Amino acid sequence: MREAVIVSAVRTPLGGFNGALAGIGATELGGKVIAEAVKRANVPAERVNEVIMGLVLPCGYGQNPAKQAAIKAGLPWQVECFTINKVCGSALKAVMLAAQAVQTGDADVVVAGGMENMSAAPYYLEKARFGYRMGPGQIQDHMVHDGLWDIVNDFHMGISNELCSEKYNISREVQDRYALASYQRALAAIAAGRFKKEILPVAIPQRKGEPKIFDTDECPRETSIEALSKMGAAFQKGGVTTAGNASVISDGAAAVVVMSRQAAEELGCEILATIGAQASYGIDMKYVLVAPIWAVPKVLAKEGLAIDQVDLFEINEAFAGSTCAVMQALELDPEKTNVNGGSVALGHPIGASGCRVLVTLIHEMIRRDSKTGVASLCLGGGEAVALVVKR
């Protein structure tokens, strides 16, 4: 089987809910990171075989959003494209599929990642096609219904955090302190310029004058344990989940270029990382947020590694509580895990986050000269995805 390598890794800064990127559609954001990923890889556009992009909230975008993004990126019409929805794992699964295509010889060059504009997700009227004979009609929120809601158990993902927190005995105080650390780490990373190499600045059109350049993640903010502890429970009375210790609804996109090592060497591309083992795992949907507890050991077993042999982990912070539960169960070193903050502070554009955490992981591995990293995310449906990358 051929070796799959990553030769570029880029993301937009993440915009807050109804924030800086709210007016730029997901396919536009996707087009920007695809174009930049190909440019940074120094790969001719005609050498790209396929584009795979995650998108969880596609309502209103039209046919094959990945193709739209590829065309906006300036790629040729003949490039094959498809859009994947594996909820929060979409963009990492896109990279996993790209690696499989390269490893099996089906492709030499694949652009993979994800894109999401949660701010722009529309509302829709489910029975409008057939009419309402009598009684009230309900307008659905595409973002909540299709992105954040467990249809089987009929509850918001925040309720899963309540259940996981109870099961793993993660207190409100522990969650708030973890959230504070995530914000502090993200702000420190921004101040030190650690995200600059991975971020593609985005020009935001203004009503008058020149576009405004958006180049810094919008969501990280100064806070304190006192401020976090005063926030009310968001999902159930007396609950432990708040707006302060949950991931931030946000907008953004990320992409990587995956190639065969042979093609990368032929074109003189700089190899940023080699793709190792990949894994998925499914559990009881009620406890979806802690599924990485099983996905991470599975991927490490496939790679022949122990937890303590991994230099860096990126575990997506859907909620502080569930992240604490995963770290507790796997005995992860906090100094190796989400070292620049995570989705609690940076934001969680659900269709893009899988690649966002990978992009951040790769750039931090380069900065530290780390040899092995693992990215993992829980995802709606009671599953998690995990990927090993090596340098």
Give, region by region, the residue ranges found by the protein language model.
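Condensing-enzyme catalytic core mediating Claisen C-C bond formation in acyl metabolism
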Residues: 1-26, 139, 224-290, 294, ...
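N-terminal extracellular/periplasmic Venus flytrap/periplasmic-binding protein-like
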Residues: 11-12, 23-32, 40, 174-266, ...
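Conserved catalytic cysteine-centered active-site region
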Residues: 55-109, 152-156, 222-248, 329-356, ...
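Flexible glycine-/small-residue-enriched beta->alpha junction loops
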Residues: 109-163
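Active-site pocket-lining segment
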Residues: 160-162, 195-198, 206, 276-345
